[in-house]
A protein has these predicted regions:
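Functional-site microenvironments in short loops/helix caps that host divalent-cation chemistry
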Residues: 20, 26, 86-231, 235-240
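A generic structural motif
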Residues: 28-30, 186, 247
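Acidic helix-start/capping segments at beta-turn-to-alpha-helix junctions
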Residues: 71-85, 127-130
Length: 248
């Protein structure tokens, strides 16, 4: 596990990153093998921001890329609610400077990461990191992990808290749970549609009304919620509790 501070301690805007060693995990939904069990997915080593992107960092991006300010961004790239919690194009409450930026579309998050020389993490990368607690790479079946996920989802207005507010996990990554939902690069690879599901193996990865029976872990409440949310999104959607972080 390697820390890459990327100028954070020098007052620059890039978030520190950690190297996530590659491995495999069993996704909540995936392709079934001959024994009807969900096949593990291999995840290659990559780097991930230890925090979600903050309001202050996103403001610095907008200063360099004015076409993404809320008064100028095109509707095809972001809904009218884009950055609606800010007072103006470049102004927000000083108390929110280190809170995660929200009301951000997938297009905007993708562009920010590209301008940082990074990218959005894939669903598999994000879920691979999110399954860890402080001591274990995969803590999904542990009672304390499940209770923490449910408790964090019941806490209101977590998007107002500063990044780094939650304990870091095994990889040294903060806020994977308990702060905001996060965009991933391939969010629309999971569909929320009962009508679109066809009777073939490849569609086992689709999330639909009755697909809980095809899930690999019925106790993973947090993953159910994330898959359902991703399946309902469009790339220009913005939400009060939806932020992002970058990968490399």
């Amino acid at each position: 596990m390697t820390l890459c501070f990327c100028g954070w301690l020098l007052g620059q805007t890039s978030t520190p990153m950690v190297t996530i060693k590659g491995g495999s995990y069993v996704p909540l939904y995936g392709v079934k093998g001959e024994n009807k069990a969900t096949k593990p997915v291999n995840v290659k080593s990559f780097q991930l921001d230890i925090y979600p992107v903050t309001n202050a960092q996103y403001k610095a991006f907008l200063e360099k890329h004015p076409e993404w300010r809320r008064s100028r961004v095109k509707g095809i790239f972001a809904q009218k609610s884009y950055l609606s919690h800010w007072k103006s194009d470049l102004e927000f409450s000083p108390l929110e400077a280190q809170a995660p930026v929200t009301h951000i579309s997938w297009f905007a998050a993708k562009k920010y990461c590209e301008c940082e020389g990074k990218r959005l993490p894939t669903t598999d990368e994000w879920e691979y990191v999110a399954q860890a607690d402080a001591q274990n790479i995969d803590a999904r079946k542990k009672k304390h992990y499940q209770e923490y996920i449910v408790r964090s989802m019941q806490t209101p207005k977590t998007y107002l808290q500063k990044v780094g507010n939650t304990p870091k996990n095994y990889w040294g990554v903060y806020d994977m749970h308990g702060l905001v939902w996060e965009w991933v690069a391939d969010f629309n690879s999971v569909l929320l549609s009962g009508d679109s599901r066809k009777d073939k193996q490849g569609d086992d990865a689709l999330f639909c009304g009755g697909s809980a029976l095809n899930a690999s872990d019925l106790t993973n409440y947090g993953a159910f919620m994330r898959y359902a949310l991703r399946g309902s999104l469009k790339a220009n959607y913005t939400m009060l509790n939806m932020g992002f972080r970058c990968a490399l």
